[in-house]
């Protein structure tokens, strides 16, 4: 039985995941991990959210939005060249997890703590 999960996004509107599709089931399982869920608490714009009341987006919302864009691009690519098919899981996973290693205050904390979010993403 296929289960659908819907995320309501301010930019992309409804982002639907279907567990009947193996690649989307993988994404749903990744979203449910503690490492990904912590992105809900990290502001997309870091300290700017303290100055601009409209800068409220999280790395969680951003990452799901990036996945949505990657899925649309993939669907277009596959229409023109079926050789892209074998890269679906890698593309989807990379799009979703690209910011997994971000710390508090986003890129600002990288300079303060000498920490690179790409390296932390790989470690996680």
Residue ranges and their predicted role:
Residues 86-124:
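Divalent metal-dependent catalytic cores for phosphoryl transfer on phosphate-bearing substrates
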Residues 24, 47-48:
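Accessory alpha/beta interaction modules
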Residues 36-46, 94-101:
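Active-site-adjacent bridging/hinge elements
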Residues 1-41:
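Non-catalytic interface/linker regions that flank or bridge core catalytic/transmembrane domains
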Residues 45, 51-90:
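Alpha-helical phosphate/pyrophosphate-handling elements in metalloenzyme active cores
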Residues 20, 60-64, 114-115:
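Generic detection of long, well-ordered alpha-helical segments
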Residues 22-25, 65, 120:
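Generic recognition of stable, solvent-exposed alpha-helical segments in well-folded globular domains
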């Amino acid at each position: 039985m296929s289960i659908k999960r819907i995320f309501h996004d301010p930019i992309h509107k409804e982002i639907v995941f279907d567990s009947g599709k193996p690649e989307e089931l993988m994404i749903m399982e990744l979203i449910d991990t503690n490492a990904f869920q912590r992105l809900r608490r990290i502001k997309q714009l870091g300290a700017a959210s303290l100055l601009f009341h409209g800068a409220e987006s999280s790395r969680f919302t951003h990452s799901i939005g990036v996945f949505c864009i990657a899925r649309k691009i993939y669907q277009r690519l596959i229409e023109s060249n079926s050789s892209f098919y074998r890269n679906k899981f890698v593309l989807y996973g990379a799009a979703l997890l690209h910011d997994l290693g971000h710390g508090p205050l986003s890129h600002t904390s990288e300079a303060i703590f000498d920490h690179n979010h790409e390296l932390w993403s790989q470690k996680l």
